[in-house]
Amino acid sequence: MAIHLYKTSTPSTRNGAVDSQVKSNTRNNLIYGQHRCSKGRNARGIITAGHRGGGHKRLYRKIDFRRNEKDIYGRIVSIEYDPNRNASICLIHYGDGEKRYILHPRGAIIGDTIVSGTEVPIKMGNALPLTDMPLGTAIHNIEITLGKGGQLARAAGAVAKLIAKEGKSATLKLPSGEVRLISKNCSATVGQVGNVEVNQKKLGRAGSKCWLGKRPVVRGVVMNPVDHPHGGGEGRAPIGRKKPATPWGYPALGRRSRKRKKYSDNLILRRRSK
């Protein structure tokens, strides 16, 4: 998806760089309901993730992460915008009349055909088990649990690499740099997720960020002591602590957030690069 620059007629267009418009389809059976967000609050209404709220109303698009239409060819009918993710989505019409949305693989165009199964060609957009893929294949939408659907490498521009197969496991290098083991029977989609230029997008004005449901970010040092451990003091004051802290008093900037003794610890061969 190309990045579009406007004429510099106003400050917002002068500083903005947005992706070219991919229109949404009219409402169908795969687009339903208002996508209700928690706005960063938990069930008690307490803020657990800051700087979230507002934003435009969204409709949820049901995405087929399982790709369980086995050995039935489908054709890409349209490439559409999805407000719930950075990646674009494709509407697929299968030969048996089924219609589904999938993540848009990079380079796929309207009219291309895709298929999922065990003995299918190694072609962009096709889904098949890791055991049937050659080493070095670029993949996305990777299953962790067999039959649950893809959970890894689903963001815009994400791509993982199959680097080894031994025994019942396959070794993958993920976009974060992490190297981990996954069952060879799990499925993945060949290719890279589209919309790789999303990191070049520049909103240009505060209103555009407000539409996305993101609120302004305020530094803790300018808050009151009741609101943040860094707050308080007369005028410009230091944080008053040896190390920075979160609003709840926990160490910030470098503290590991992964749970200890997690079930997948023995599957991770190398931690992600920071």
UniProtKB/Swiss-Prot annotation:
Region annotation (Disordered) maps to 1-20, 223-274
Task: Name one cellular component (GO) term.
Answer: chloroplast
Q: Which SUPFAM superfamilies match?
A: Nucleic acid-binding proteins, Translation proteins SH3-like domain
**Which Gene Ontology BP terms does the record give?**
mitochondrial translation
Q: Which GO terms describe its molecular function?
A: rRNA binding; structural constituent of ribosome; transferase activity
Q: Which HAMAP family match?
A: Ribosomal_uL2_B (MF_01320_B)
Protein name as it appears in the record: Large ribosomal subunit protein uL2cz/uL2cy
Native source organism of the sequence: Eucalyptus globulus subsp. globulus
